[in-house]
């Protein structure tokens, strides 16, 4: 959580009365370590990924794929391997630049002439997900991957920090080590079901504290 100043700041600005919602167990334990009440509800962006919703996500490889890159976590070798892997395994590859320098980083890669670049805004990304029926999402942007699952798209998220791995430990999202290209290749070709394990009881418990109780 950081040093003494950070802990003091959190204890000052966060409520001692209410239970705080956290996205994973690690964040829950951090808040509890400074005597604040917390419950692990998962990220609110995941709350609609119920068993009924996930059952509608395709299990087989799509014809097309959306790729994102992370300009803040550059690895030319691994990212070039990923681009080559996707070009060899999908009929169409789309690149959606989300960060400020994502496009600049992507342009430094080789073998990208056949990749379709999507405008760097959420509306274009949403339009692509809605207009292409058979499309997977693969890459490092966690919330772009969750957004794809909200649109019922098969999703593979590659880790570049602890956020995706921490959430995956509790909620079973499809996360792979960035360097595990062999495992990713096998997963792309395999049939699997998306089974995000949302804790609806925790979500309901957190929401109920805000209900006005009648005397």
Q: Where do the PLM segments sit?
A:
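Active-site anion-handling motifs in enzyme catalytic cores
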Residues: 1-215
């Amino acid at each position: 959580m950081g040093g003494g100043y950070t802990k003091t700041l959190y204890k000052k600005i966060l409520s001692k009365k209410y239970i705080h919602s956290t996205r994973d167990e690690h964040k829950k334990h951090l808040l509890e370590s400074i005597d604040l009440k917390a419950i692990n509800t998962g990220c609110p962006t995941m709350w609609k990924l119920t068993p009924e919703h996930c059952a509608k996500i395709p299990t087989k490889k799509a014809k097309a794929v959306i790729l994102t890159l992370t300009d803040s976590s550059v690895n030319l070798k691994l990212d070039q391997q990923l681009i080559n892997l996707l070009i060899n395994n999908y009929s169409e590859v789309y690149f959606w630049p989300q960060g400020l320098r994502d496009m600049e980083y992507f342009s430094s890669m080789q073998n990208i002439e056949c990749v379709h670049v999507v405008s760097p805004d959420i509306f274009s990304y949403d339009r692509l997900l809605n207009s292409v029926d058979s499309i997977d999402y693969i890459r490092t942007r966690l919330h772009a991957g969750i957004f794809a699952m909200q649109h019922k798209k098969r999703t593979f998220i590659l880790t570049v920090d602890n956020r995706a791995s921490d959430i995956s430990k509790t909620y079973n999202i499809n996360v792979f080590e960035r360097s595990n290209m062999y495992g990713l290749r096998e997963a792309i070709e395999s049939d699997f079901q998306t089974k995000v394990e949302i804790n609806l009881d925790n979500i309901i418990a957190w929401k109920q504290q805000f209900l006005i109780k009648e005397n």
